Amino acid sequence: MVDAVVSVCLERLVKVLVKEGNVLLGYRDQFQKVQNDLQYMRSFFKDAERLKRKNEVLKCTLADLRELVYEVEDILADCQLLSNSSGKLLHGFSPIKVPAKYQMGKRLGEINVKITSIKDNITSFLGPLSQSLHGNVQEEGPPRWSSPIYDHTQVVGLEGDTRKLKDWLSQADNSGILSIGVVGMGGLGKTTVAQTVFNEKEMELHFEKRIWVSVSQKFTEDQIMRSILRNLGDANIGDDRGDLLKRINQYLLGKRFLIVLDDVWSEDTSWWLRIYEGLPKGSGSCIIVTTRIEKVARKMGVQEARIHRPKVLGEGHSWSLFCNVAFAENHGSCTSTELECVGKEIVSKCRGLPLAIKAVGGMMLCKPPYYHVWRRIADHFREELTDVDDNSVMASLQCSYDELPSYLKSCLLSLSIYPEDCEISKDQLVRWWIGEGFVPVRNGRLATEASEDCFSGLTNRCLVEVVEWDYNGKISTCKVHDMVRDQVIQIAKDESFSGLNAAHRRHLGLTTDIKEKEIVTSKKLRALISTTKSGEVNKIASSIGNKFCDFRYLRVLDLSKSIFEVPLSTLLGKISNLKHLTCFNLSNTHPLTQVPQTLEKLHNLQILDVSYCQSLKSLPPFVMTFENLVVLDVSHCGSLEFLPEGLEKLSNLQVLLGFKPARAEGEGSRISALRSLSQLRILELQLTRADEIDDNETDALTGLIEMQILTISCFNSFESDKLISKLEKVCPPLQLHELSLKFYPGKTSPKWLNPTSLPMLRYLSICGGNLAQLDKSFWGNDETCWKIKGLKLDSLSHLSVKWEMIQRVMPSLRTVHACWSPELISFPIEGVGFRGGVWKEDRNN
């Protein structure tokens, strides 16, 4: 992690040394010395990071260095702030700048002395301690994890396990509720077995109600009952415990149901006995409990004859699972005998544990397919392993962490602040990474693209678990596997990334049960992030707002999904002191009717998110002076009528969501302002009236050659005929990769929706509206056809299209999502007129 922190700092140092030469005059030599020393030490960091787990002196030395690097970053931030705020030279004679100049020189001098001392210590320690690399490392920590989602391609060798559970489930009679236990060590596949059975089509048909409950180590009886009710579709959840259980009984009475209680730890099962007594008996209902503790299963009413204990995978299944992950790009096939030999050696170290196999397979997927590279990792892996099974798993995860690029280490550690079993928004993560500078932006790539790549890097290494996919194959939410989470939390504590030590903590998650003291005493915070679970909200007190001025170097402030006990203008009265703030998230907050004027001085903002604020009526004009904005998200703000004038000034904007152009003769930014946003990659355009587009503005999108994703939404549109006429003239950019039409008012698709006008389109989504037929241009001709891979048709009650026509014009189609569209003809998806489903191409045929 020190490597990660130093890498980010070095990158910023180089930028400042190049761009802020005048500001640094008088201190360039000192900054240059910091840079040289850090670059010298970075060559030792990889070995030092491994050695520190075995040597306390080196561990403390690296911790001291990490703190100093943070201080260097703070000085850099202050330096840039002085330059941006005044435009005057730091060596000038302004009485305001003289104290700042003196303080900066003093701080730099102190830091250089300390860094020199640390450099000497690291150099001296690495020599005598290098041989200890071959010693054993034992990392402890109880793993925890739960998720109802699974990837069937990564289920190998569990056929016998699932068959046994299905046989037991079929034996349930009307005499009571059949209880089944799945018991074993962490990472053995208990949850996967339950997931597979839970998602079987025959189970869906057999049980009228299926309920998945993730039971974490910290839970309450009320939380369990609320989770059951949410599974049953009851969103109106009250507070009375007796009423909760009564409503559960009413929902399940007379129905055959299956309840999975996943990852139960508590040996005090009295909570479950009370819930169990309130469940209706009979009807062939079943309960599956997964746990590591056999005693827990027994106390929850599972008989010995109904306890299943999964075994570790054999060599063949272990290798197959590894290949499915490590050679995913080659359809799970290893074609090199050399790699197969060393690969099987690596797999053998995992000892048949599916979690370890998948994690290591994900790591190898990202490695060059060269024997010497795999040989090196195999040798290192052996050194990390111990003879204790649980510790072997943690060693495999530690190995995956050690092999991460430095920037991905910071990204992975950001997951440490989220509660157990929390579903994490991908957008929240990647925007945080952009705001704090975790993501390296090189070779002309933009921050939004680089951050998406970082997220993909974690998923490819199986370090995060996918909860929900979008139709386009992108991940919208994820979870952290319990074992990964334990390891990440431990590392984050050691590195003061997050943890219990408020004096050094840099990152903190806002949860419903967090104490105010935890926030106000964390004065070194870089990021304060809302980490509430689905359906929960934070209550933000005014006393916390009064402490914002203490978080001098806060970069990321995420107050999403919060309720403010005082007016926001009062709560954020001192937020103008957060001069270094780069990411501010107020999405889904209540009540937010206007953006406070105190934000006006936050000119370093790169990300502003006020989405899902239904009461927000307007954005203040000063937002259009934030020239560093990369992301502006005002989507799903029902009361917001337009954006203020000046949108064209946001030349660095890469993502603009919820843009409502001003009407003719009205105030605000017109659609023509988009012409100036040359870096725009993602645009969501909301159109409701014809006068929001002039005839001379219909080509406003054409010149946006970097745009990849476009959404056009016409929800609650007026003057449909006139608006349709304007929409027909819109010219999306040729290189568009993904298009979404929402609530399109016309009965026929626009003529520009054709394979010639959009030759690069890969994903198409059409949701809602009056569409009844696709224009003849949509079907192309003998020489042109779509290159679309993913198609989504949702809530199109009038659209009549034949499946064979879709197949003909979209030969590259891989996935189709279709629902609530009853006029679709011969689609290979059951219930397309209702909830529908997903069709995926069978590549084996």
Give residue ranges: language-model regions:
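N-terminal amphipathic alpha-helical segments
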Residues: 1-57, 646
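Charged, amphipathic alpha-helical interaction modules
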Residues: 43-144
